[in-house]
């Protein structure tokens, strides 16, 4: 019964997919990116494991400070949401990814960078103010933070190039906040990024490290890797199976969450036009209530029920899912 109803709703969804997909499933436009990263999941997990070890090693080379970093999650979001989420409590930089001429973003919580500089190099003048966070950065502080970002990015993208046939060369720009990145480097607020987030603890300070890649580039990288792996039949066949299964599940999510309009015909009555024209205020029209009431969506029968009174309200009492093989008799 349920499967029959689900198939009916699927037909309704497919019929109106263009009109309702954005309302029903807000992440529909990023579905392909999630599929991409599912396919790259094992490669990315191995890459991040190596990256975390290398990052910890670099920190320990500077001092004996206790450092722990772990991969938190990745999210796909527009640049305006990145700015909204991390606001101005992070030091940020943007970098160019050559030869694709795409811009990425790296940021770290200011309490982490502040502590590192203070612990390793004797302090800094990093303070929040109404004039903006970066007005208080000294030249030495900027150089130190940029060096830290450079180490992080070089190691990260060295490993990224190992898991993807899409090779990247990083060109760091100047240290700045997210508003400056938006204005100076012409990142559109609607541009979409994959943000890899890492939990970071240095001594007793906790914060976040984030690396943002443009989704278009990330998607392109995985596509290039798949195309160049055409001789690996098992790899292609596995990816095809994974893609098919995930698309089925995603489509099921879309169908289960789609909003359909139910129309319920409570009565049936037949009358001639001459009688309708002859009606006067107060005239009574006898009606014949149906024994079985059907709830329709887009003229597709979905539910069978009864018309009843419940707590002084007229209600549709569900009896069963509609089954086209049964004959529902009406009175």
UniProtKB/Swiss-Prot annotation:
Keyword Chaperone: no
Highest rank taxon of the organism: Bacteria
UniProt-recorded name of the protein: Flagellar motor switch protein FliM
InterPro entries: CheC-like_sf, Flag_FliM, FliN-like_C, SpoA-like_sf
Gene: fliM
Signal peptide interval: none
Its job: FliM is one of three proteins (FliG, FliN, FliM) that forms the rotor-mounted switch complex (C ring), located at the base of the basal body. This complex interacts with the CheY and CheZ chemotaxis proteins, in addition to contacting components of the motor that determine the direction of flagellar rotation.
Record keyword Transmembrane helix present: no
Entry keyword set: Bacterial flagellum, Cell inner membrane, Cell membrane, Chemotaxis, Flagellar rotation, Membrane
Predominant location: membrane
Molecular function GO terms recorded: cytoskeletal motor activity
TM region positions: none
Record-level GO cellular component terms: bacterial-type flagellum basal body; plasma membrane
Lineage per the UniProt record: Bacteria, Pseudomonadati, Pseudomonadota, Gammaproteobacteria, Enterobacterales
GO biological process: bacterial-type flagellum-dependent cell motility; chemotaxis
Subcellular localization: Cell inner membrane; Bacterial flagellum basal body
Family affiliation: Belongs to the FliM family.
Topology within the bilayer: Peripheral membrane protein
